[in-house]
Amino acid sequence: WMRYVNRLLDETDPHVAKMTALNLGFQAAFLGTKTIRKMREVHNCNIPWLILMDPTSACNLHCIGCWAAEYGNKLNLTFDEMDSIVTQGKELGIYFYMMTGGEPLVRKADIIRLCEKHNECAFHCYTNGTLVDQAFCDEMKRVGNLSLSISLEGFEDANDFRRGAGVYDKVLHAMDLLHENGLIFGNSVCYTRKNMDAVTSDEFFDLLIEHGSRFAWYFHLM
């Protein structure tokens, strides 16, 4: 654990590290939970620690088995709607917001704007990674309160079978960019009976670590 923590501190941009500690550690985990407990009594209902929302149903990929493609690209939350969700959430003590889709980075300008306006909150996007570029990394460093989970289904053959030719290389490039810029990110792994051995292998974990990943979520195919 100490090796992990030391590497995280050494390789993370100072502003990003500070914002993560303040927003996720203090605001969400400490101050927010105190407010949540009070609001549960006031409203006599459960209040979650985080809110998950889909900025858009649009996606630049068409992955095998993904339900998002069935919804097309016309379902979108406006910036004002997302802003309202976060504003109301903060009143209840919620300071952590996750975004899925679709591909949330189709709306990356609005997401950055949201991070900027609510700079005491932590934001996290589940993304395919193909829209990550240096300009976006610069914006992530500037706001400091946005992290990513990048989808990866295993090694090149398995990943590109589901996501399309060339996506594996784009994902590794995105991971390298994020790592070089001192940004915090992890991976989202969808496992099936076909890739389970690969995505639980030491070689796969070594690949994630080599390219700067800090954590991994594992989901079964739904």
Name every feature range the model reports, one short phrase each.
Residues 1-135:
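Conserved alpha-helical substructure of the radical SAM core
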Residues 69-73, 155-157, 222:
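A short, flexible beta-alpha/helix-coil linker loop
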Residues 82-99, 107-220:
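Radical SAM/AdoMet-radical enzyme domain recognition
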